[in-house]
Amino acid sequence: MKPMVLTVPAKKEWVLVLRMAAAGVSALYDLPVDVLEDLRTAIEESCELLLHQDYTAETLTLKCEARKDGLHVCLSAMERTCCCAEEPADADIARLILQPLVKEVELEQDESGVHCVHMTMPARG
């Protein structure tokens, strides 16, 4: 199956759409309900992190792809412009929140902050 890619405006009200899309992908890959709930929570936490950095993003892009070792999920802030309007979210705290929810987590960052969250959910059954 091809990867699922969804791009939405980088606004808090669109996080629900990303959570629902991730839940749908989880159902397609027959992941257990507890994994589905962990993924939805991880998506929400990742969005919170990406929406509170030293930049303003125009869009958030969610990519989900099934692999042998599990469901790979990438959430990226796209079309970023610098702005220091608020205190950025702490990447270390975000990682601590995400680690118990997912099999693996990696945060991509540069001088303006975290711009991509890579996660792997456990393989089904």
Across the structure, where does each feature detected by a protein language model lie?
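Bergerat-fold GHKL ATPase/HATPase_c domain
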Residues: M1-T41, C84-A85
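Conserved beta-strand-loop-beta-strand hairpin that lines the nucleotide-binding pocket
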Residues: M1-M4, L49-G125
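Conserved ATP-binding N-box helix of the HATPase_c
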Residues: P32-T56
